């Protein structure tokens, strides 16, 4: 049974809740002392992991729609991508304001250059910014064929973002490895598409 347009609307409402609820949990954890002795790192990692989850969910939509024969499912992809950008922006903001501090924002540029994992992170964020700004149908019409070329940059983000996470942790744990493995699986599902680019 295929999803109807009305069901997709309700699914989008649910996905908006999924995107917003982690923010409520984070506020609750901050106010109730639910974070560790290093709350700044907790906030950075939580926002970064949530952004990664939405990135992976965005990449999952196309193969899921194809294999499940649910073409209307594609309509949720933009929404997931927007939430990915929201959480990536919260991740960047938490680093800039909580790690560096508002009085040291001038150091942000030098930090991004001197620390390679931060360089990967800001490249990923800038790519997501470009994708977000051009995610409308108006932008798609204006850019024409170039729109798809630009939005293929999401595959670069799918590589850089997990590497950024792996590189940022001082002690390697299973979590960043799992995210990287999931990203590789989702990219592998597009093997035929990548081969066509070479032709």
UniProtKB/Swiss-Prot annotation:
Cofactor dependence: FMN; heme b
Domain of life according to the entry: Bacteria
Molecular function GO labels: electron transfer activity; FMN binding; heme binding; metal ion binding; oxidoreductase activity, acting on diphenols and related substances as donors
GO cellular component, one term: plasma membrane
GO biological process, any: protein repair
Subcellular location: Cell inner membrane
Annotated transmembrane regions: 8-28, 82-102, 116-136, 153-173
Keywords: Cell inner membrane, Cell membrane, Electron transport, Flavoprotein, FMN, Heme, Iron, Membrane, Metal-binding, Transmembrane, Transmembrane helix, Transport
Pfam families reported in the protein's UniProt record: Ferric_reduct (PF01794)
Details of cofactor binding: Binds 1 FMN per subunit.
NCBIfam families: PRK05419.1-2, PRK05419.1-4
Record family assignment: Belongs to the MsrQ family.
Assembly and oligomerization: Heterodimer of a catalytic subunit (MsrP) and a heme-binding subunit (MsrQ).
Name under which the protein is recorded: Protein-methionine-sulfoxide reductase heme-binding subunit MsrQ
Gene: msrQ
């Amino acid at each position: 049974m295929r999803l109807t347009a009305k069901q997709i609307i309700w699914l989008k409402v649910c996905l908006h809740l999924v995107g917003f609820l982690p923010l409520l949990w984070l506020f609750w954890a901050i106010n109730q002392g639910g974070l560790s002795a290093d709350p700044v790192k907790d906030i950075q990692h939580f926002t970064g992991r949530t952004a990664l989850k939405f990135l992976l969910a965005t990449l999952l939509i196309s193969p899921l729609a194809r294999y499940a024969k649910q073409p209307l499912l594609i309509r949720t992809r933009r929404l997931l991508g927007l939430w990915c950008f929201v959480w990536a922006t919260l991740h960047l903001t938490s680093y800039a304001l909580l790690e560096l501090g508002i009085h040291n924002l001038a150091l942000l540029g030098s930090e991004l250059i001197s620390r390679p994992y931060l360089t990967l992170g800001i490249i990923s964020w800038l790519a997501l910014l470009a994708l977000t700004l051009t995610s409308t149908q108006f932008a798609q019409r204006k850019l024409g064929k170039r729109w798809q070329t630009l939005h293929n940059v999401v595959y670069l983000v799918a590589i850089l973002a997990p590497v950024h996470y792996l590189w940022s942790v001082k002690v390697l744990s299973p979590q960043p490895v799992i995210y990287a493995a999931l990203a590789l699986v989702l990219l592998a599902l597009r093997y035929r598409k990548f081969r066509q680019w070479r032709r």
